[in-house]
Amino acid sequence: MTFFDFESHQAMTDANCIFCKIIAGQIPSRKVYEDEHVFAFHDIAPWAPIHFLIIPKLHIPSMAQLTTEHAALMGHMMTLAPKLALQEGCNPYPDGGFRIVLNNGTEGGQEVHHLHMHVMGGSRPWLRG
């Protein structure tokens, strides 16, 4: 699998980005997983009993900035999500499960402008009437 060429894009971070600071270890987090391409950590204000984020180490502000060069990276995030969901305590498919949310842009609910995937499982507070 070919990922985005991180070696030639080492400077692609944002010094003011809270997620870039978490990746750099400047802000503490409860790490779920890390490899050379992504970092996953528990949400500080969870909406569900299991709620963590998967973020690319490369600073990509939103889905609007994705290119075909990022396809393998996004595929990696998508295939990693179910593995981490099970690891963190989600019940397996089909009776269990989890939800993936990718907010895009301010009007789409994105609060931190560094691409991130919410993975939530357990009770479903978003179904409240």
Task: Specify the residue positions occupied by each region the protein language model found.
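HIT superfamily nucleotide-processing domains
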Residues: 2-129
